[in-house]
């Protein structure tokens, strides 16, 4: 299963939940806007926390897509 993580920086409100929840996958720039550190997380823990961050993001900027192939 492949996971792809992306973030729409134009809708990010800088809440920081992504970086706090999944620090191995997300960070924030100097303005507090999300940055993706790992677009295809492989570690189980990073995948789990990326999913959680996607659910917690208040603006919907974080997107997590999983392929079953």
From Swiss-Prot:
Keyword match Transport: yes
Reported induction: By herbicides.
Pfam families on file: Fer4_19
Protein keywords: 3Fe-4S, Electron transport, Iron, Iron-sulfur, Metal-binding, Transport
GO molecular function per UniProt: 3 iron, 4 sulfur cluster binding; electron transfer activity; iron ion binding
Membrane-spanning ranges: none
Residues annotated to bind [3Fe-4S] cluster: 12, 18, 57
Cofactor: binding details: Binds 1 [3Fe-4S] cluster.
Top-rank taxon: Bacteria
Names of the cofactor(s): [3Fe-4S] cluster
UniProt function note: Electron transport protein for the cytochrome P-450-SU1 system.
PANTHER family in the record: FERREDOXIN
Protein name: Ferredoxin-1
């Amino acid at each position: 299963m492949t996971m792809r993580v992306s973030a729409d920086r134009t809708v990010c409100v800088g809440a920081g939940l992504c970086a706090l929840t999944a620090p191995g996958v997300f960070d924030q720039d100097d303005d507090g806007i999300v940055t993706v550190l790992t677009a295809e997380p492989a570690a189980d823990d990073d995948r789990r926390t990326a999913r959680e961050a996607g659910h917690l993001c208040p603006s919907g900027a974080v997107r997590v897509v999983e392929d079953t192939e």
